[in-house]
Amino acid sequence: MSLICSISNEVPEHPCVSPVSNHVYERRLIEKYIAENGTDPINNQPLSEEQLIDIKVAHPIRPKPPSATSIPAILKALQDEWDAVMLHSFTLRQQLQTTRQELSHALYQHDAACRVIARLTKEVTAAREALATLKPQAGLIVPQAVPSSQPSVVGAGEPMDLGELVGMTPEIIQKLQDKATVLTTERKKRGKTVPEELVKPEELSKYRQVASHVGLHSASIPGILALDLCPSDTNKILTGGADKNVVVFDKSSEQILATLKGHTKKVTSVVFHPSQELVFSASPDATIRIWSVPNASCVQVVRAHESAVTGLSLHATGDYLLSSSDDQYWAFSDIQTGRVLTKVTDETSGCSLTCAQFHPDGLIFGTGTMDSQIKIWDLKERTNVANFPGHSGPITSIAFSENGYYLATAADDSSVKLWDLRKLKNFKTLQLDNNFEVKSLIFDQSGTYLALGGTDVQIYICKQWTEILHFTEHSGLTTGVAFGHHAKFIASTGMDRSLKFYSL
């Protein structure tokens, strides 16, 4: 039978057992340990020498103990030193085991702390977004206190009650009529002449991609869904993204001027104000936001709808917004006060609106519906004055030409239809490739060119209605396209998160 000492891991000369832990020890080692600690080395229970129980085993014949000479004395000293080393080694093993357990516990605590920090960070971010949403309500502007001639919004307005409509007052109607008269007169003066600075078709046909920017919106939620250029300075680009942000970008300096945060869902429509440093955005979160670009802050939240806002257009006066929604209503709102002036639906249709666009004169506008209809409305009378059937599938985009005569429309039927507003009929249909998607339509400022964006970007020359340019640079669906001043460049955005520019 072989016994092993629990301290030295060697066969003991004088084995004994501890009744506390039932472990076997070399008597001299355990006695030294008890003398120092008074406990059992295995379970740290109190233990005395009297409690130790000797174990009787058959020992091999051993030589007589050394006599008191110098060599035996050295051996005895070495034996004592070895005993001390064994005791120290055993203590270190115990401490190592304890340290490992403490380290494991600390690692679990660290992991739990990281999870808590991540959750709290997410909650703080959500709280900040909620605060940004509530801030526009802080400084309520009483509508009567804001003169109609005031050039810009200087405070934050109250999100209005959906049931509280101000109405189209005679003063507002007269203002709209006066502006339309001025614009019509200017258009007649211009006649059919094309600006000399406008890029010629043969030059436009040579356009190629000259720049691409992918850092405007989040990479984790890719996609730019809306695009607009500032009418007074087309170097200023406005985009709305799937990341819920609105971004103002300067083409000339290639710098982001402002990142506007506040929407709780993706941004699907954006509009630049032509003369004030304001931009507008709409989202499926059922809100329209008015932003100050210099302050990078929201100055008004217009709550005109109960469902997703699908279209946004600024009136020629620069004082009113037109919006369309999944709630089947179009709304006409005052940007000075953030209040809804009127809100109308076509009760005979009962269908969601997909887009909305003002005519250049501002007295009529068009809306697209989910059931393939294009409806023309009289703003002063709030009545549906004409319908343009012919598409199949939801209407995806509509665009009025600056000449005031043409309307371009697109739907999920791989076609673009051109309508003559004087004769109220379809005079041309651009039939595209099968499964070609059209998400954006726009005429240039002179009404000479028509651009469409979707599966790719195509440019047509009006009157002949022939394609003169075709871009396939976007790796995803093209969601927006726009012309620079006098068509000196073309801009496009897409689901590949890029803003691209094309020119000579």
Swiss-Prot record:
<dbReference type="GO" id="GO:0005819">
    <property type="term" value="C:spindle"/>
</dbReference>
<keyword id="KW-0833">Ubl conjugation pathway</keyword>
<feature type="modified residue" description="N6-acetyllysine">
    <location>
        <position position="122"/>
    </location>
</feature>
<dbReference type="GO" id="GO:0005811">
    <property type="term" value="C:lipid droplet"/>
</dbReference>
<dbReference type="GO" id="GO:0005634">
    <property type="term" value="C:nucleus"/>
</dbReference>
<dbReference type="GO" id="GO:0000244">
    <property type="term" value="P:spliceosomal tri-snRNP complex assembly"/>
</dbReference>
<dbReference type="GO" id="GO:0001833">
    <property type="term" value="P:inner cell mass cell proliferation"/>
</dbReference>
<keyword id="KW-0808">Transferase</keyword>
<dbReference type="InterPro" id="IPR013083">
    <property type="entry name" value="Znf_RING/FYVE/PHD"/>
</dbReference>
<feature type="modified residue" description="N6-acetyllysine">
    <location>
        <position position="261"/>
    </location>
</feature>
<feature type="domain" description="U-box">
    <location>
        <begin position="2"/>
        <end position="73"/>
    </location>
</feature>
<dbReference type="GO" id="GO:0006303">
    <property type="term" value="P:double-strand break repair via nonhomologous end joining"/>
</dbReference>
<keyword id="KW-0551">Lipid droplet</keyword>
<dbReference type="GO" id="GO:0061630">
    <property type="term" value="F:ubiquitin protein ligase activity"/>
</dbReference>
<feature type="repeat" description="WD 4">
    <location>
        <begin position="348"/>
        <end position="387"/>
    </location>
</feature>
<feature type="modified residue" description="N6-acetyllysine">
    <location>
        <position position="179"/>
    </location>
</feature>
<feature type="repeat" description="WD 7">
    <location>
        <begin position="473"/>
        <end position="503"/>
    </location>
</feature>
<dbReference type="GO" id="GO:0042802">
    <property type="term" value="F:identical protein binding"/>
</dbReference>
<dbReference type="InterPro" id="IPR013915">
    <property type="entry name" value="Pre-mRNA_splic_Prp19_cc"/>
</dbReference>
<comment type="pathway">
    <text>Protein modification; protein ubiquitination.</text>
</comment>
<dbReference type="GO" id="GO:0071006">
    <property type="term" value="C:U2-type catalytic step 1 spliceosome"/>
</dbReference>
<keyword id="KW-0206">Cytoskeleton</keyword>
<dbReference type="GO" id="GO:0016607">
    <property type="term" value="C:nuclear speck"/>
</dbReference>
<keyword id="KW-0853">WD repeat</keyword>
<feature type="repeat" description="WD 3">
    <location>
        <begin position="304"/>
        <end position="345"/>
    </location>
</feature>
<feature type="modified residue" description="N-acetylserine">
    <location>
        <position position="2"/>
    </location>
</feature>
<dbReference type="GO" id="GO:0000077">
    <property type="term" value="P:DNA damage checkpoint signaling"/>
</dbReference>
<dbReference type="GO" id="GO:0000398">
    <property type="term" value="P:mRNA splicing, via spliceosome"/>
</dbReference>
<dbReference type="GO" id="GO:0000974">
    <property type="term" value="C:Prp19 complex"/>
</dbReference>
<comment type="subunit">
    <text>Homotetramer. Component of activated, catalytic and post-catalytic spliceosomes. Component of the Prp19 complex/PRP19C/Nineteen complex/NTC and related complexes described as PRP19-CDC5L splicing complex and PSO4 complex. A homotetramer of PRPF19, CDC5L, PLRG1 and BCAS2 constitute the core of those complexes. The interaction with CDC5L, PLRG1 and BCAS2 is direct within this core complex. At least three less stably associated proteins CTNNBL1, CWC15 and HSPA8 are found in the Prp19 complex.</text>
</comment>
<dbReference type="GO" id="GO:0004842">
    <property type="term" value="F:ubiquitin-protein transferase activity"/>
</dbReference>
<protein>
    <recommendedName>
        <fullName>Pre-mRNA-processing factor 19</fullName>
        <ecNumber>2.3.2.27</ecNumber>
    </recommendedName>
</protein>
<keyword id="KW-0963">Cytoplasm</keyword>
<dbReference type="GO" id="GO:0070534">
    <property type="term" value="P:protein K63-linked ubiquitination"/>
</dbReference>
<keyword id="KW-0234">DNA repair</keyword>
<dbReference type="InterPro" id="IPR038959">
    <property type="entry name" value="Prp19"/>
</dbReference>
<feature type="modified residue" description="N6-acetyllysine">
    <location>
        <position position="244"/>
    </location>
</feature>
<dbReference type="GO" id="GO:0071007">
    <property type="term" value="C:U2-type catalytic step 2 spliceosome"/>
</dbReference>
<dbReference type="GO" id="GO:0005662">
    <property type="term" value="C:DNA replication factor A complex"/>
</dbReference>
<keyword id="KW-0747">Spliceosome</keyword>
<keyword id="KW-0007">Acetylation</keyword>
<dbReference type="InterPro" id="IPR055340">
    <property type="entry name" value="RING-Ubox_PRP19"/>
</dbReference>
